[in-house]
Amino acid sequence: MRAPATHIGDVFEIPISDSFKRYMQFVVVDSCQLGGWGIRVFKKDYPLDCNSAIDDILNGEVDFFCLTRAIGHGVLDGLWTKVGKSKDLGDLDKMVFRTYVERVPGILASHWFVWKANHNLKEYKTLPRRYRKVDYGGVMPPSHVVERIRTGRWFKVQNVYDDYDSYLTKWGCERISVPFLRQQRKD
């Protein structure tokens, strides 16, 4: 089956649980990062049975911006469905991304790239404070976008503490708490 055509301005709904959904809008094709398709994801959760007006959705607060490559494949995979279209794309100057390039000895120094959608990259050796909370600029698959909406993280990360508790239970052990030990100085 072929992925449906998507266009700038398309609005999609994303079920995030058995009772809630969120919305996102395709707003730009970013020429700076592999031609990634820029989307803005809105923060408000809506009940699944709610049919909100597109204008009300687009006036809501933006949770995050991201780049993806296959919006149509997200529809095919059942991750989101198209619900409408709007010419209101919001303020694209707020769509700022960052990415880090690791050092390759003798070839490349470590540095940060920061850019606004469809603007030139700026390169920094140290990431300036004003860019520390901007969104990651990698091109993500649709499943990672949904994971970010549901959990606030790009990838599924196991909870180390839950794994530790299950390990202790398996072996019949109890969790112990070790207080912070302060070394006392002898004069």
Task: Show the residue positions of the predicted features.
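Intrinsically disordered, low-complexity, charged/polar segments
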Residues: 47-187
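Short N-terminal edge-element motif at the start of the domain
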Residues: 1-47, 52-53
